């Protein structure tokens, strides 16, 4: 078996791996091998390229690892879905395309952890801007010439978007024109990773398209990383599988693990890096007993609050097969129409209590009543709010089941394990009902479909959450940055106690961010790419940003309709 040599080997061509591959190969003297277990991002496949088709990749296994959790003890012992992207682009190939960076205080909070002082919001903002091309042009908060195409919401797409935002404001919450700008808190339009031609802006399209022709980058698809190879405590390469064939690759400088919050700890554990007791159970030779690998797993849990729509303005007709050819043809020929949007064009972030320092609840508004994965569509005109808490105190874990790289690991998010989780979800349902009963929605709002108007008491709300809440597909934090006993990597993604090995993806977040994770993951990779290259970090951007400082979470005096008593 021959062993080829590269300066860097990247395991995983997802939101982070494609950034690293592109930035590292800007130096023509550096060679990079990019390994991806999935296939290409076929540009002719509408399932991944059409924004409106976002549910399709989650329904099969061509583009989705289709993980399932162990029975979740606080969720009626349900085995819950944990979809992760497979193919060039990783989860940016199958996600909802919502471009949300997180709250400024997420990063300021990270920076209070020992050793993470350079992860403040103002340190991270230059890398958000570097990655982005926003369709309305750059400003103090946004970039204009980055690899990721970001499309802003346009007025008049669907009257339900504006009505739902107006309802949030009428309920006493702020209005914000930019969820990624000065103030995340409030309701407003939502940016999306969609190209000007109406195509999904995955990192394969944005980053790899500019790098894949470089002679110093080799991309190998259908290549499943089996183990990281070590020479003592130094990572020296990777052994991987292509079908039934095994190949080895040697890394002169570093191995970069970018396989995501599920597969990165799985690969480390399979390679002998992780909790020693777990490795001994599978007779894996221990390279380093690192207890935090696979621990601290976090996610966002969400539920769908659904209503009948009294006027025929929802997307319900677009779900019918006889209307879809016309929608698809317009999208294919012109890049316009219903097919060119993910239809998450409005949303918001709120605090449910005045003492919450920054938003603890996120909303995605959708002008149809359907599950995120395309299942359980309501057979009528409807609309819904996806709502969930942002910083659950519950923690889970990813644990290896088998030395076989094709075997899925044991995953337990441990959703809703803490009392605060239940309080926040009850608050979220009641806040959503207050928003939905505002005058802006009077002409559209019919009966409440889910959870249903009769679901009112704490016990009834808890039963609904336990039986119906689903993942928002934001696993993270399972190889966290930091310097405490459970930290896995340092502030530059270098694995503690080893040489030549980094983890760079959403797994290294110490605490999950407020919102969707694609944009923060790209930022993390951009920031660490400069560290790997030995470059000076981009200068901090000195801009103001909103801090609540104990301000009222909701201005009840300005609310048009007061909450109902129950």
Curated annotation (Swiss-Prot):
Gene Ontology CC: membrane
Cofactor(s) this protein cannot do without: FAD
Pathway: Amine and polyamine biosynthesis; betaine biosynthesis via choline pathway; betaine aldehyde from choline (cytochrome c reductase route): step 1/1
Region described as Disordered: spans on this chain: 180-203
Positions bound to FAD: 7-36
Domain of life per record: Bacteria
Pfam family, one: GMC_oxred_N
Keywords: FAD, Flavoprotein, NAD, Oxidoreductase
Enzyme Commission number(s) of this protein: 1.1.99.1, 1.2.1.8
Active site: 474
Function: Involved in the biosynthesis of the osmoprotectant glycine betaine. Catalyzes the oxidation of choline to betaine aldehyde and betaine aldehyde to glycine betaine at the same rate.
UniProt family annotation: Belongs to the GMC oxidoreductase family.
Protein name, entry field: Oxygen-dependent choline dehydrogenase
């Amino acid at each position: 078996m021959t062993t080829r040599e590269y300066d860097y080997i990247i395991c995983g061509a997802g939101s982070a791996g494609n950034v690293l591959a592109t930035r590292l190969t800007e130096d023509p003297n550096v060679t990079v091998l990019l390994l991806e277990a999935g296939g290409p991002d076929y540009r002719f496949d509408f399932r991944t390229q059409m924004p409106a088709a976002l549910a399709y990749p989650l329904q099969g296994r061509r583009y989705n690892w289709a993980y399932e959790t162990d029975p979740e003890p606080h969720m009626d012992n349900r085995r819950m879905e944990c979809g992760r992207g497979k193919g060039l682009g990783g989860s940016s190939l199958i996600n909802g395309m919502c471009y949300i960076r997180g709250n400024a205080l997420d990063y300021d909070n990270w920076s209070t952890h020992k050793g993470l002082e350079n992860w403040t919001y103002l340190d991270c903002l230059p890398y958000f801007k570097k990655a982005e091309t926003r369709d309305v042009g750059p400003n103090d908060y946004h970039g204009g010439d980055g690899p990721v195409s970001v499309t802003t919401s346009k007025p008049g797409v669907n009257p339900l978007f504006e009505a739902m935002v107006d309802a949030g404001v009428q309920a006493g919450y702020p209005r914000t024109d930019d969820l990624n700008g000065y103030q995340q808190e409030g309701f407003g339009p939502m940016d999306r990773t969609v190209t000007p031609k109406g195509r999904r802006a995955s990192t394969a399209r944005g980053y790899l398209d500019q790098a894949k022709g470089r002679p110093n980058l080799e991309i190998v698809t259908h290549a499943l990383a089996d183990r990281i190879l070590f020479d003592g405590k130094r990572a020296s390469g990777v052994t991987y599988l292509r079908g039934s064939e095994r190949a080895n690759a040697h890394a002169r400088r570093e191995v970069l693990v970018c396989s995501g919050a599920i597969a990165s700890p799985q690969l480390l554990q399979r390679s002998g890096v992780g909790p020693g007791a777990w490795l001994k159970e599978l007779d894996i030779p221990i390279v380093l007993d690192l207890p935090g690998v696979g621990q601290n797993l976090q996610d966002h849990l969400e539920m769908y609050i659904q209503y009948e729509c009294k006027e025929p303005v929802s997307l319900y007709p677009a779900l019918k097969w006889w209307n879809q050819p016309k929608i698809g043809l317009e999208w294919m020929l012109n890049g316009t129409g219903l097919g060119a949007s993910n239809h998450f064009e409005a949303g918001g972030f709120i605090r449910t209590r005045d003492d919450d320092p920054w938003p603890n609840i996120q909303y995605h508004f959708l002008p149809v009543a359907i599950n995120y994965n395309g299942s359980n569509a309501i057979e009528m005109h409807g609309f819904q709010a996806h709502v969930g808490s942002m910083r659950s105190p519950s923690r889970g874990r990813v644990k290896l089941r088998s030395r076989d790289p094709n075997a899925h690991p044991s995953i337990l998010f441990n959703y809703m394990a803490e009392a605060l989780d239940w309080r926040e979800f009850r608050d979220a349902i009641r806040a959503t009902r207050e928003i939905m009963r505002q005058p802006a929605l009077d002409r559209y709002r019919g009966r409440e479909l889910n959870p249903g108007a009769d679901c009112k008491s704490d016990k009834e709300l808890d039963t609904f959450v336990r039986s119906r809440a689903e993942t928002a597909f934001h696993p993270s934090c399972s190889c966290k940055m930091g310097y405490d006993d459970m930290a896995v990597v340092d502030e530059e993604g270098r694995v503690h106690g080893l040489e030549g090995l980094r983890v760079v993806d959403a797994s290294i977040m110490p605490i999950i961010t407020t919102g969707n994770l694609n944009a923060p993951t790209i930022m993390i990779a951009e920031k660490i790419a400069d560290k790997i290259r030995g470059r000076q970090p981009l200068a901090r951007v000195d801009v103001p940003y909103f801090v609540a400082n104990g301000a009222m979470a909701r201005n009840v005096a300005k609310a048009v309709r007061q909450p109902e008593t129950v």
